[in-house]
Structures are given as structure tokens and as C-alpha cells.
């Protein structure tokens, strides 16, 4: 069984584009859950470009599955996470000038911070994952820092312009997933996954969960949000069933 985390950031992006009260990320989360999502992922960025504090607070008590809150390692975000108390927090790198998260967190370069934030969140009963590139050293450092969950960054795979490069990136992800699992870690993956490239990733047996947002929200424009979620879940499950 493989789980689908629906990222609802870009529902909020559409709302923020006009400064309206709609579409509601909370409503989108509930629709995603009723359509087969196993958890809801959202990124409260420091610049608040899409998800807002009020979205997180309103969503927390009404979700029937799990909340996976993505956040940068800052005192402000730690305070928010401790107050909201989601089931999961995923520590991610963040740059104000980026369009979307550009790569995995450099655990080796920020080891002390990763260990500190992982410890504080774990003490509060929140499961911590680290968004990292599919690299053995980064995975080992995440484990050493106390994380027992990782999310492998699949962006290089998704953006590979040629089949040979895509296969090479897929091999890296497979190896990373195997290594993480050998340490006893829960291995998730995400970033840039869509209806055309998700199946090879979903077929990796060590991967427990995929977090996907932009592709689902975009496809929903044509087929509706419930159907977009159902189609993605079906693709993932068919890949795993082989």
C-alpha cells in the first residue's frame, strides 16, 4: 500500500492571486480527503505567498486524516508548529526568491539546526521528516540528527529532459529509498510528480507516501478536484500492484 498526500498550496495560490476568500484551502482539503487522499500537506512559508496562518488553524481541527506541515527551520515556524500540533512536520529549505522549493535540505551543512528542530518537535509528539535529495550521506545525517522519516526530493527526476537522465535519477531514488529503509526509516517522496511520471516512483517498494500538489490542482481545472485526486491515487496503486 502506498499513501497519497495531497498538497493544497496551489489552491491558496489561486486565492492569493486576486486577494479573495475563495477558493478555500480548507474546503479543498476536505474534498481531497473524501476523494481518497491519505493526508493533507501544506507549506506555511515565511513570506506567506500562498497558505496563511488562518488556513492552518482552521484546517487542523476538521481534518479526518493527517496534517503534514512543511516549514523552514525558524523560531517563528517552530512556534507555529508547536501551537498547531500537526501529526507530521516536514523540514524544508526555503528561499524567498524561489518559485518553489528548489532542492533538498542540506542536513550536513545545517546539522545542528536540524538536530535542534527535530528534537523540539519530537518532544512535542510531532513526527518529523526531512526533505532531502536522494543522497546517502544526507540520509545518514538525517538519521543521526534524530529524524526517522525522510522525503526524497524527486525534482531532478521530474525535470530530466532526456530518458537517459530520467533513468539515472530514478536509479538514485531507488538506491536512496533502499538505504533509508535499511536504517529503519520511513521513506516518502515528492516534488514535480505528475500523472505522466508518477508510476515509476510509486513502484519503488520502499516508498511509503507521495506528496503531490501542483499537478493535481492543475488537472482539477479540467476534470474536477475529486476526480483529479482519484486518478492520481489510482495510478499510484496500479504501479504498486505490479
Curated annotation (Swiss-Prot):
Residues at which 3-amino-2-oxopropyl phosphate binds: 7, 18, 192, 213-214
Site (Transition state stabilizer): 151
Function (record text): Catalyzes the complicated ring closure reaction between the two acyclic compounds 1-deoxy-D-xylulose-5-phosphate (DXP) and 3-amino-2-oxopropyl phosphate (1-amino-acetone-3-phosphate or AAP) to form pyridoxine 5'-phosphate (PNP) and inorganic phosphate.
Gene Ontology molecular function, alphabetical: pyridoxine 5'-phosphate synthase activity
EC supergroup of this enzyme: transferase
CDD domains: PNPsynthase
Catalytic residues in the record: 43, 70, 191
Residues involved in 1-deoxy-D-xylulose 5-phosphate binding: 9-10, 45, 50, 100
Subunit structure of this chain's protein: Homooctamer; tetramer of dimers.
E.C. designation(s): 2.6.99.2
Subcellular location, principal: cytoplasm
GO annotation terms (biological process): pyridoxine biosynthetic process
Protein's name according to its UniProt entry: Pyridoxine 5'-phosphate synthase
Keywords: Cytoplasm, Pyridoxine biosynthesis, Transferase
Compartment(s) of residence: Cytoplasm
A single Gene Ontology CC term: cytosol
Top-level lineage group: Bacteria
Pathway(s) per entry: Cofactor biosynthesis; pyridoxine 5'-phosphate biosynthesis; pyridoxine 5'-phosphate from D-erythrose 4-phosphate: step 5/5
Catalysed conversion reaction: 3-amino-2-oxopropyl phosphate + 1-deoxy-D-xylulose 5-phosphate = pyridoxine 5'-phosphate + phosphate + 2 H2O + H(+)
Family stated for the protein in its record: Belongs to the PNP synthase family.
Cytoplasm keyword on record: yes
Cytoplasm among keywords: yes
